[in-house]
Each structure stands twice: as C-alpha cells, then as structure tokens.
C-alpha cells in the first residue's frame, strides 16, 4: 500500500471518485456506506450505473427486449449522469463519459469530505475532461449483424 507516502504525489485518472461535487454523487457515496457499513471499500464503478441507465433508456425507447433493437437504440441514446453527459459511441460501442484527474490528499487537511476505504486518504479533483473531449479516431472494424 502507498498510504501516507502518496499524499500530494499520487495522481489518478478516473470516471468518478467520492469527492466529486453534486447531490447525486454524494448520495452514491453515502448510500453505499449506509448499505455496507462494515465494508472498508467504496462505490467506485460509475460505469455500472451508466450502463443500466442507458439500457433502461433503450428498452423504454424501443418498448422491446430484442437485442438488435436495443443495440440500435443504445447507439442513439444518451443521458445526463451524475458527472455529465454520457453516451455510447456508435462506431465502436465505447462508453463516453467525463474523466477526472485527481490527487491523493489527507482528509484532515480539510480539502475533501470523504476518504477512500476508510483510510483517512482520499482524492481531490485537479481537472475535468468532458466526454466529447475524449473522442479520438477509432480503428474498430466491428462486424455488425443485419438484424
């Protein structure tokens, strides 16, 4: 473990961390901690929420559970997630979402509200890259079924 040695040195690029601003982000952190009070871990993979929200939107749009119809609807779908706009890229089916660069800090310095895994250390956002700024040319040559 890195622990205290990583304070103000360790950086991460992530899709989410538990000190992002916003009511929904805070409710994700608190909801997880309330549901699993004995666990020394935290909600982390926001992409799971994104996937379910996009799938629900595709099913609602198509009024179907047909995989092909849902796949086509997913390619057109988007939603406003807790960190910003999220959507699936049509040409390679990759999830596009904001990314955050953050620095490991000591919770006692007052710059963050929540630590990670109850360690007394957490992450403070340095910068945000919106989803549309992450798009690069794809080399994907996905072979799609006709139906």
Predicted regions and their residues:
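Extracytosolic ligand-binding ectodomains
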Residues: 1-147
């Amino acid at each position: 473990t890195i622990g205290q040695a990583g304070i103000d040195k360790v950086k991460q690029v992530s899709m989410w961390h538990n000190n992002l601003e916003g009511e929904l982000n805070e409710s994700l952190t608190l909801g997880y901690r309330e549901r699993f009070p004995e666990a020394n871990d935290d909600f982390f993979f926001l992409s799971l929420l994104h996937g379910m929200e996009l799938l629900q939107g595709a099913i609602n749009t198509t009024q179907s559970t047909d995989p092909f119809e849902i796949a086509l609807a997913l390619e057109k779908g988007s939603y406003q997630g807790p960190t910003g706009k999220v959507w699936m890229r049509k040409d390679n089916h990759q999830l596009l979402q904001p990314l955050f660069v953050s620095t490991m800090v000591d919770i006692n310095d007052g710059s963050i509200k929540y630590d990670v895994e109850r360690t007394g250390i957490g992450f403070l956002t340095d910068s945000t890259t919106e989803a549309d700024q992450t798009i690069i040319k794809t080399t994907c040559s996905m072979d799609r079924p006709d139906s």
